[in-house]
Amino acid sequence: MDYIEAHRYSFANKSMLEKEKLCDCFYCLEIFSPKEIKEWWEDDHGWTAVCSYCGMDSIIGESIAYPLTKEFLKKMHQKWF
């Protein structure tokens, strides 16, 4: 799995996440509906989701072609934290 490629989807992801049914946080490992996201951070590239459970900007959506599983999230967490 390409954890670097998957990580790229955690930035400026508002338009993508608004179309998703599920997303996940690779910091706290929660899998949830993007409708639960209450905070977005703006930067030069767009709006980035902030996890409602842990406050980190480590959210990726289900359509990125990587599995939304606890195992994948744990490996993402190990790579980036």
Name each model-derived stretch.
Residues 18-23, 44-47:
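Short metal-coordination and nucleic-acid-contact micro-motifs, chiefly zinc-binding Cys/His arrays
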Residues 38-48, 65-68:
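Short linker/helix segments within small regulatory modules
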Residues 26-34, 42-43:
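RING/U-box catalytic core of ubiquitin/SUMO E3 ligases
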Residues 2-20:
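N-terminal first-folded block
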Residues 25-28, 51-54:
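Short cysteine-rich clusters marking metal-coordination/redox-active sites
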Residues 34-38, 60-61:
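Short, non-ligating residues that shape and space the ligands of small metal-coordination modules
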Residues 56-69:
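Short metal-binding segments enriched for Cys and/or His
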Residues 71-81:
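N-terminal, charge-rich interaction modules
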